[in-house]
Amino acid sequence: MPDLSDLSRYIEISTNYVDREPAFEDGTPNPNFGKGAYVEVWNDTANKYVRVDNNGVVNGSAILIGTTSRPIRIHGPVTFTQDCVIKGVVEGQGTIYTGRNIHIVGSIKYKNPPDFRSNNPDQADKSNSSRDILALAARGSIIMGNTATFGYYPLNYMKPPFTKPRYDEFGNLVPAYNALEIDETGKPRYQSVYGDATISSISEPISQLDCVLYTNFLGGGQLGTGGGGVTFNGSIISKDEAMVIYSLPLVMNYDPRIRERKISNQPLIDVSLPRTPEIMISSWRDHGLFTRRNFHGAS
């Protein structure tokens, strides 16, 4: 797994990002062509959208809440130096990197979701190239649910022996994650810098997550507390997992738009996710068909 410990790398990516695609694969013009990274939320007092970032970077933490009529707007890779707290409706294509945690305090839903129901994969790719996609990548952990209500479940599974040490991409040993350990902010690692009172005041049950989640540490928390189960439309990539699911079903739908495709080795939508060098096929040899006998000797 690519390591997120060097946050300066992602700050540089965010600061220097410029959208170079004039149009989507479905032929529609790209309204963000030539623009840098940004994230916007609706401000009721100002009665307009306001940018949360400065040149693609949020110095500190921020709370992002979107609604159907006033979704969170994101474009490109945006880096938060501390926490990002998020819930609600999202519009656009982008990634949020955080220097600490990502706290998901309610369902996350796309305003313009993809639709993969097609007998023609290439046509489906083109149709979905302009649809919303969000990636959340935490240098710390991805914590889901109302931390004020965390007890034995899930906290017991957010510390050793359930979490394990790991080696980073440079061969350095990283100690096992311990949610109860106090970090440099003065908070336990599983809590937000905003504190439990603030998190509790804005938390809602999580029933749907339209996003790709990535963390070198832990992805966990409380999901499905409102009944009706949980649906992931994306993926979760984490070293440790401590999700407590309070209702069923648990449905996980992979979003193929983030994987490398065909000979281009590029994803359909590049939202600057952390990647390792992909495995390349250098040669292919067809040895023809052969049969293998089963355990009973029949061919």
Predicted regions and their residues:
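Predominantly polar beta-repeat domains that present long G/T/S/D/N-rich surfaces used to bind, process
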Residues: M1-A23, S107-S299
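Long, low-complexity, polar/charged, intrinsically disordered or flexibly structured peripheral segments
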Residues: M1-S69
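Polar low-complexity intrinsically disordered regions enriched in Ser/Thr and small residues
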Residues: N30, A37-V39, N59, T79, ...
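Detector for repetitive beta-architecture
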Residues: Y49, N55, S61, S69-P71, ...
